Regions:
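Cleft-lining beta-strand/loop regions that shape enzyme active-site pockets
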Residues: 4-195
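Short, solvent-exposed loop/turn elements at domain surfaces
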Residues: 50-52, 73-77, 209-210, 258-260, ...
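Conserved functional hotspot residues or short segments at active or partner-binding sites
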Residues: 213-214, 218-366
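Glycine-rich active-site/cofactor-binding loop and its immediate structural neighborhood
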Residues: 1
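A generic structural motif
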Residues: 31-35, 207, 251
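Short clusters of small/polar residues that mark proteolytic maturation junctions
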Residues: 10, 43, 128, 203, ...
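Polar, glycine-rich mid-to-C-terminal structural blocks
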Residues: 160, 172, 177-179, 183-249
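A sequence-level detector of short linear motifs
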Residues: 7, 40, 200, 215, ...
């Protein structure tokens, strides 16, 4: 980095990051070792946009799909741009994927919820021991009130994502599909001290419009082990094993029963699929073979990938080059990893969409 050699010096990652950062418009010299070859780079420092929408495309003629990874300050803007493109393409239904979305900006969750709800529909409210109830309702000016919506959630869906899912469910606006969400619904306020430090104090909790508390309980000191215990108790694979607090019974706008006790319980349960995680898949994950393969494909097909601008073209190109054969050859050559008889047939439908997605991120496709 610059004139300093850091390879082999055990330089901490945060120190390397500080060395590479600097005023916008200035340059930093890097020497990168790629596949055994040292390659020099002169990089101009600038703001790097981090997008929150991982994917937005039409599944068929009338169904759109959007994957939202986090709620950032630009989420609403990105979401509006994505839905505008999908509406122009004929979208009548939307699959909104909030799996593993840990939340983020509260106001963005409110604005996204508002897009789907009628005037005065409840979105969420907050209330605490020393904090009076504060309601947040829709204003009816959303542009997606007539779009059918299905929301995908899982145990990694938390905070702002749960606010959105709870609002959709309690207003009977759409269908929630997946597994019980994380259960993170605390309202915290920062208190700053004169020495520059600070502390965040919990002052209230978030509740869905029907009155369900999103925050899961802290009982038995098992808060940090909750997800592990869900696996152990079979909740991830069987709806019958899902813990439901039957005493915390609430009703949606149309009178459907919903239960509190922490997190959002889906309308349609989808078990986690463990049958496709073969030993070959697990070993590839441990060594990040999929990510390194994607980078190698970019190096090899940089010219082609840089011209692909739509999903159909990307899919046709991937089919034409036999991506499966390329990946299996790469795994065997670089890590001596080969699927046992029958393993690839089991795991191919699990691995290849991930691999194609990683390669596709190097294209010009939004």
């Amino acid at each position: 980095v610059g004139e300093r050699v850091i390879a082999g010096t055990k330089t901490p990652q945060d120190s390397m990051v500080r060395m590479m950062k600097g005023p916008k418009g200035t340059k930093v010299k890097l020497l990168i070792n790629r596949s055994g070859t040292d390659i020099p780079f002169d990089i101009t420092r600038d703001k790097i946009p981090v997008h929150c929408i991982d994917a937005a495309f039409m599944v068929n003629d009338t169904t759109g799909y959007i994957k939202l990874s986090k709620f950032t300050r630009t989420t609403y803007k990105e979401f509006k741009e994505a839905t505008s493109r999908l509406l122009d393409a004929g979208m009548k239904r939307l699959v909104f994927d909030l799996r593993d979305n840990s939340g983020g900006y509260f106001d963005q969750a409110l604005m996204l919820s508002n897009e789907f709800l009628q005037n005065k529909d409840g979105i969420v409210y907050m209330e605490g021991l020393h904090r009076p109830r504060q309601n947040y309702d829709a204003d009816g000016r959303g542009s997606l009130k007539d779009i059918q919506i299905s929301v995908l959630i899982d145990e990694g869906t938390a905070s702002s994502s749960e606010i959105f899912a709870g609002a959709i469910q309690d207003n009977d606006r759409g269908v929630i599909v997946g597994r019980r969400s994380f259960g993170k619904g605390l309202v915290q306020e920062p208190i700053n001290f004169t020495d520059g430090s600070g502390v965040r104090v919990t002052v209230a909790r978030f509740y869905t419009p029907s009155g369900r508390c999103i925050q899961k309980p802290y009982d038995k000191n098992n808060y940090q082990y909750d997800i592990y215990e869900r696996y152990a108790h079979g909740e991830m694979t069987s709806a019958d094993s899902m813990k439901v607090d039957t005493t915390a019974l609430f009703y949606t706008v149309k009178g459907r029963r919903v239960y509190g006790g922490g997190g959002i319980i889906p309308d349609i349960f989808v078990p986690i699929d463990t049958t496709l995680a073969t030993k070959f898949y697990i070993n590839c994950n441990k060594k990040a073979v999929q990510m390194r393969f994607a980078a190698s494909m970019f190096d090899r097909y940089r010219g082609v990938l840089s011209t692909i601008e739509d999903f159909s073209s990307l899919d046709r190109w991937m089919s034409s080059i036999d991506m499966e054969a390329h990946f299996l050859e790469y795994a065997a050559r670089t890590e001596n990893l080969r699927p046992a008889p029958g393993e690839w047939e089991k795991t191919v439908s699990y691995m290849m969409p991930q691999i194609k997605a990683l390669v596709g991120r190097y294209s010009k496709l939004d």
